[in-house]
Regions:
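Second-shell loop/turn segments in exported
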Residues: 29-35, 114-121
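Bacterial N-terminal signal peptides that target proteins for export
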Residues: 1-10
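A cross-family detector of function-defining hotspots
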Residues: 40-97, 116-181
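Bacterial N-terminal signal peptides
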Residues: 9-19
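N-terminal periplasmic "start-of-domain" segments of outer-membrane beta-barrel proteins
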Residues: 105, 109-113
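Acetyl-CoA-dependent GNAT
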Residues: 100-102
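Sec-dependent signal peptide cleavage junction
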Residues: 17-28
């Protein structure tokens, strides 16, 4: 009886080991897109990409307080969202690529493909590239629309990095979203 229990525990450990290894490999340094990290100031982003074009403002509740939200388009389908604090405007989200399924038909521009994560993943990278760069491919979260868009999400301590692919239109990544948890 004890041998059977021990054998079951060993098999379970072997099954769970790849998931644990994958999660352990994602660091806070990996949580960047195009050189932008969660928490960077607006001035730091503008050093990299210029002033950009402001396109939206809003209000959000953060830590029980109403805070300002500011969104800027930096071209090449790069959009950054900031939250105001007593220290100024700080990055809470970076989005690169397309949101619309129809736009998945078009090839990303060379400029937008030049923006990448610290592990070299960019628009048009494939699922195989993700698995090679991050050591595993997480279970996809797929939309219910047709054709489905699947997100492959890697979690850090304070942020998540998600890669979106619509396999019916292209094997490559069409959108990347870095956001705080």
């Amino acid at each position: 009886m004890k041998i059977k229990s021990l054998l079951c525990a060993a098999i379970l450990a072997l099954i769970l080991l790849p998931a644990a290894l994958c999660a352990a490999e994602i660091t806070e340094e990996d949580m960047a897109l195009g050189g932008i990290h969660i928490g960077d100031t607006r001035a730091e982003v503008e050093e990299l990409y210029g002033n950009g074009n402001h396109y939206a403002d809003g209000v959000d509740v953060w830590n029980g307080e109403d805070v300002g939200i500011h969104a800027i388009d930096y071209g090449a389908s790069l959009h950054v969202t900031y939250r105001s604090s007593d220290r100024g405007w700080h990055v809470i989200s970076v989005h690169l690529g397309v949101d619309d399924v129809n736009a998945y038909l078009s090839k990303p521009s060379e400029e937008s493909q030049s923006l990448e994560t610290p592990r070299g993943i960019h628009l048009d990278s494939t699922k195989e590239d993700l698995a090679k760069a991050y050591g595993c491919l997480p279970k996809p979260k797929c939309s219910n629309n047709a054709p489905p868009i699947c997100g492959y999400c890697y979690d850090g301590e304070t942020a998540q990095l998600a890669f979106y692919i619509c396999a019916e239109h292209s094997p490559g990544i069409r959108a990347i979203w870095l956001h705080e948890k």
